[in-house]
Amino acid sequence: MKWGILATGTIAKKFASTVEQMGAEGEQLVAVGSRHLESAQAFAQQYSIPRCYDSYETLAADPEVEAIYVATPNTLHYENCKLCLEQGKHVLCEKPFTIDPEQAQQLYRLAEEKHLFLMEAFWIWLLPLYDRLREILAAGTIGELKQITCQYGFVASGARKNRKFDSGLGGGALLDIGIYNLGFLRILTGQDPEKVETKEVHINEYGTDDYSRLALTYPGGCKAESVQTIGQELERNARILGTKGSIFLPDFQHAETMTLEVEGKEPEVIRCPVDINGFEYEIREASRCVKLGRTGSDRYTPQDSLALTRLMYDTRMSWGMKFAGEV
């Protein structure tokens, strides 16, 4: 598929590098757009992209572009995705999809109306290790889920700190990395939580969250704890406890390894390495769905995306945390 990239930041560079390595699969980078021509030109030169533009509008209007990867800050996702869809482009939008569920619903409806593919780029959902984990849970290998814990933290600094904390850009730990925790819990349970309690939250001087600890209860009684912070280094680990065993993931984001322990058996280390860096699976899924004429993925569905968007929105509303310009 012929890709355009909207924005030229760090995550866009990772996406471009991944597509570069997927040329044999038919993936191509054909255009990039930025608000600044110099940025677009430098990006295009780095990744051998034939065309560069100094506006998102001209990128979206390029007739050679089939699909666009949206890599702008959180609060811009809605308007950027809408622009691309209205110009007849398939869209893969960086997570978090939108800052509120109403925006998300509008975009998915627009994609259906225009018969275009739209998916949130929540890459960990499609990792091979999680396919294996789903199989283990479905087989009842560790019994019924009883308790899940997951944590993710890093220290945002420099220019990255300004963007991560900026209320006008939809900053804060919950939307930036908490989505990994909450998405991981949805991978395991396949459900919305019945109850969400904020045990701790810290809102910084910028008006965004840099730390929170959530307690969630799922149908069937499974309890979960999610810790997310952009002010402290935490290992990205997770533990799943069932009635007959447990699973430990030393890194549940870049998930390639887990240890399965079942009563009466020796611990088993399961490895499912990625082909490139993990982004390749969302790119393959987008191409697969476009070829099949689908408007959404049947693996990471619009319903899953909407559920996570709603969960994060309701959580931050319970904190009284609104982004700059948000009613």
Which ranges hold each PLM region?
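Hydrophobic residues in well-ordered beta-strands that form the structural core
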Residues: 53, 93, 118-120, 249
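Beta-loop-alpha module in the N-terminal Rossmann-like domain of NAD(P)-dependent dehydrogenases
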Residues: 47-110
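Contiguous beta-strand/loop segments that form the cofactor/metal-binding neighborhood of enzyme cores
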Residues: 183-257, 273, 285-294, 326
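C-terminal helix-rich "cap/oligomerization" subdomain common to oxidoreductases
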Residues: 58, 67-69, 219, 288-327
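Rossmann-fold dehydrogenase core element
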Residues: 105-123, 144-146
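N-terminal Rossmann-like dinucleotide-binding module
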Residues: 1-47, 321
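Predominantly a Rossmann-like dinucleotide-binding segment in NAD(P)-dependent oxidoreductases
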Residues: 124-196, 204
